[in-house]
């Protein structure tokens, strides 16, 4: 009777072990497939997917923080001395992003307008929008450089007109005016003398195109046909490529619109088209990490992002170039001598930093980064940082430019930052981190259990003999 009980027990254990092995094996094979299917179903742009409402109205709180560079020695700069700068701010804005005119097309693409609305946050800022700062008179100094090649008599006329308008090389205006626009009779004067030189009327502000406006009509892939194409830009404002630059490679519209990427990312690089910089940008993988428990890949700007054509030949199309580390954006900024760079000329030619007083580039403060969840291609935490610079110099024939020594002068730098938090983070964590890892553990638990069960069964069988 003892032997029969043992036999029954060993058969039972053996069957239990086999069952565990079977379940574990199934999970091992099917688990990743189920997870993959779930991810695909939920990241494509489809009104029935989890991430659709998140894609439509981004629930992540975004902040725009702006630092101005005040010129402390404007009088001396006019005499040819080195500019001394003092960083003011940050002036922080809460940024709301949402999409309108969402239209699905037959070829698995969707088009939309992305809007940004900004609201000043006094409690997060160091100062108010009423603060006065001394900065270059952007329109006048920009126009002066643009008119350098014009006939002398025309420059003389402009110079006289500027005098009549009491225009000087530097201006003392409020943060609010410089950002959101100020009326300037100079705009009308330039439009009268040199029609078409500047394409705007009435008001001028550096961030006018940022607020209560959209960044152009994006048409992107929905991923319904091919998930590896999801979010990839098909066209921008109806264009398959832009024509700001001098090479077809530089004019290419690559990557996504900069909000999400295709899932199952490899730790190599990611690309997006930036309407603000008028070009595609490629960031490179730096390291893996975790953000609030969610695994992430960190992508950063390569040293070559704003390199000149000599140091990095593929960038030749963005020239005419100056030193490495600044990019001429005049072609997409109504031909004004504007340059973008990393803040404080981080990762740029040291001569740019040395040409002014008061810059302290550092990786911690001035490097941009994107932390993306590689399984879904959704960013968890990001901070995109850029600096706007104006090339100023003495322009003969325009007396207002004095004896200014040619310099790429930082005007301001800004960071657009956001990180996932609250209910959005919790839902994300549960569905895409917790459940997959539970499935992962279960397969090993079942497989792990099957071994002692089968061994026990075998031992009992042997003892029975």
PLM-predicted stretches and their roles:
Residues 2-295, 302-465:
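Extracellular or lumenal secretory-pathway regions
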């Amino acid at each position: 009777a003892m032997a029969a009980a043992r036999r029954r027990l060993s058969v039972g254990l053996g069957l239990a072990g086999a069952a565990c092995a079977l379940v574990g094996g199934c999970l091992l094979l099917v688990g990743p497939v189920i997870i993959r299917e779930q991810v695909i179903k939920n990241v494509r742009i489809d009104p029935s997917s989890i991430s659709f409402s998140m894609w439509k109205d981004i629930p992540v709180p975004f902040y725009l923080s702006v630092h101005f560079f005040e010129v402390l020695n404007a009088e001396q700069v006019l005499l040819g001395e080195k500019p001394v700068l003092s960083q003011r701010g940050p002036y922080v804005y809460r940024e709301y992003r949402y999409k309108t005119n969402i239209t699905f097309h037959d070829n698995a693409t969707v088009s939309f307008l992305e809007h940004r609305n900004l609201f000043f946050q006094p409690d997060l800022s160091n100062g108010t929008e009423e603060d006065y700062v001394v900065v270059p008179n952007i329109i006048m100094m920009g126009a002066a450089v643009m008119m350098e090649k014009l006939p002398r008599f025309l420059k003389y006329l402009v110079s006289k007109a500027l005098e009549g308008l009491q225009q000087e090389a530097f201006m003392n205006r409020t943060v609010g005016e410089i950002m959101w626009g100020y009326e300037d009779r100079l705009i009308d004067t330039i439009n009268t003398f040199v029609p078409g030189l500047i394409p705007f009327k009435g008001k001028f502000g550096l961030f006018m195109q940022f607020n209560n406006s959209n960044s152009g009509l994006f048409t992107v892939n929905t991923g319904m046909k091919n998930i590896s194409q999801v979010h990839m830009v098909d066209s921008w404002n109806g264009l398959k490529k832009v024509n700001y630059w001098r090479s077809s490679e530089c004019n290419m519209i690559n990557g996504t619109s900069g909000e999400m990427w295709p899932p199952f990312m490899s730790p190599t690089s990611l690309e997006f088209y930036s309407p603000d910089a008028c070009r595609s940008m490629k960031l490179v993988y730096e390291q893996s990490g975790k953000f609030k428990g969610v695994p992430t890949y960190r992508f950063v700007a390569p040293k070559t992002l704003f390199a000149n054509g000599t140091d990095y030949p593929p960038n030749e199309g963005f020239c005419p170039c100056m030193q490495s580390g600044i990019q001429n954006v005049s072609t997409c900024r109504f031909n004004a001598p504007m340059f973008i760079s990393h803040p404080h000329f981080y990762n740029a030619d040291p001569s740019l930093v040395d040409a002014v007083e008061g810059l302290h580039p550092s990786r911690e403060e001035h490097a941009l980064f994107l932390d993306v969840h590689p399984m879904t291609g959704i960013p968890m935490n990001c901070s995109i940082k850029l600096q706007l610079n104006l090339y100023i110099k003495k322009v003969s024939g325009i007396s207002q430019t004095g004896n200014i020594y040619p310099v790429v002068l930082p005007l301001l730098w800004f960071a657009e930052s956001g990180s996932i938090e609250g209910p959005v983070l919790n839902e994300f964590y549960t569905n895409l981190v917790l459940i997959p890892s539970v499935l992962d553990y279960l397969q090993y638990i079942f497989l792990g259990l099957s071994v002692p069960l089968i061994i026990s069964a075998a031992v009992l069988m042997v003892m029975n003999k």
